[in-house]
Structures are given as structure tokens and as C-alpha cells.
Amino acid sequence: MAQRTRLGDLLRPLNSEYGKVVPGWGTTPVMGIFMVLFLVFLLVILQLYNKSLILEGINVNWNGLG
């Protein structure tokens, strides 16, 4: 039989949701949307770095970052 400790008693509420899941897809579509937005963000940064995305009037100088 497991021994009860103070630490275990303090951490027990954190584990009270164990095994409970939202039926169906839950928040998976929201996660997918954020993943796509993050991909677009990374692609824009890559294009700025490669100078394949040119923004008029904005000078991009990567030498000052190093």
C-alpha cells in the first residue's frame, strides 16, 4: 500500500482531472489554426531573411543583430 506524504497531499488536486477528456475533437481545431498561423509567421521571417519578400520603404539589415 502506498505511503501518504505531505507533498502527495499538496499535489493531489493537480491530478484530480486525470482520465477526464472532452468528448469529440475538443480544442484540436484551435490548435490547428494556431499551428498554421505560426507556419505563416515563420515563412514571412524566412522570406524577409532571404530578401524574397520586399517591403517598400523598409530596410532590412541583419548585420546589426549579430
UniProtKB/Swiss-Prot annotation:
Cysteine disulfide links: none
Keywords: Membrane, Photosynthesis, Photosystem II, Thylakoid, Transmembrane, Transmembrane helix
Highest taxon above the source species: Bacteria
Membrane topology designation: Single-pass membrane protein
NCBIfam families in the record: PRK02624.1 (NF002728)
HAMAP family linked to this entry: PSII_PsbH
Annotated family: Belongs to the PsbH family.
Primary role: One of the components of the core complex of photosystem II (PSII), required for its stability and/or assembly. PSII is a light-driven water:plastoquinone oxidoreductase that uses light energy to abstract electrons from H(2)O, generating O(2) and a proton gradient subsequently used for ATP formation. It consists of a core antenna complex that captures photons, and an electron transfer chain that converts photonic excitation into a charge separation.
Name under which the protein is recorded: Photosystem II reaction center protein H
Organism, scientific name: Synechococcus sp. (strain CC9902)
Originating gene: psbH
